């Protein structure tokens, strides 16, 4: 059966004007530009609420002493404890400081055992720093000897 080209062109014009349906491309959805962890935070708060923690009032500051000599310092921290689970929670924004920076303000609040521990920790850090300095000096000396050879 022969096809009439004129009728075919006329049908193409009519079909182009009356397009049915849309384009087949996917619409790009924009994700959350500000990724808050509110969803995770609410789940965590819900789980912690199940432990029935007790809030300790009037805590001015809290400090975590790390073994590398850094201290996590919390100003105006909210402290909660759940003794049945042996759990202590500290809520707040920590600032990471050095042990030397916080030592004068913290020393008056500590007992004798804690002071001995902190002085020992500071002494160990100083010893480690001197050992690292000696090793770096030796490395630089050997590099110079290799370069001169």
UniProtKB/Swiss-Prot annotation:
Subcellular location: Cytoplasm; Nucleus
The organism's place on the tree of life at top rank: Eukaryota
GO biological process, any: protein transport
CDD domains in alphabetical order: NAC_BTF3
Pfam entry (one): NAC
Cellular component per GO, a single term: nucleus
NAC-A/B domain mapped to chain residues: 38-103
Keywords: Cytoplasm, Nucleus, Protein transport, Repressor, Transcription, Transcription regulation, Transport
Family per record: Belongs to the NAC-beta family.
PANTHER family: TRANSCRIPTION FACTOR BTF3 FAMILY MEMBER
Primary role: Acts as a component of the nascent polypeptide-associated complex (NAC), which promotes mitochondrial protein import by enhancing productive ribosome interactions with the outer mitochondrial membrane. Also blocks the inappropriate interaction of ribosomes translating non-secretory nascent polypeptides with translocation sites in the membrane of the endoplasmic reticulum. BTT1 may act as a transcription factor that exert a negative effect on the expression of several genes that are transcribed by RNA polymerase II.
Subunit and interaction comment: Part of the nascent polypeptide-associated complex (NAC), consisting of EGD2 and either EGD1 or BTT1. NAC associates with ribosomes via EGD1 or BTT1.
Name of protein: Nascent polypeptide-associated complex subunit beta-2
Taxonomic path: Eukaryota, Fungi, Dikarya, Ascomycota, Saccharomycotina
Gene: BTT1
């Amino acid at each position: 059966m022969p096809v009439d080209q004129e009728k075919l062109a006329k049908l193409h014009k009519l079909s182009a004007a009356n397009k049915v349906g849309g384009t087949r491309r996917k619409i790009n959805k924009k994700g959350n530009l500000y990724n808050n962890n509110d969803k995770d935070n609410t789940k965590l708060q819900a789980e912690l609420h199940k432990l029935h923690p007790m809030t300790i009032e009037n805590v001015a500051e809290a400090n975590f002493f790390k073994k590398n000599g850094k201290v996590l310092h919390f100003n105006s921290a909210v402290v909660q404890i759940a003794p049945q689970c042996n759990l202590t929670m500290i809520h707040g924004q920590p600032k990471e400081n050095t042990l030397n920076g916080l030592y004068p303000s913290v020393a008056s609040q500590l007992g004798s055992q804690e002071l001995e521990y902190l002085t020992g920790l500071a002494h160990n850090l100083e010893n480690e720093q001197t050992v690292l300095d000696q090793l770096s000096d030796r490395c630089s000396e050997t590099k110079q000897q290799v370069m001169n050879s």
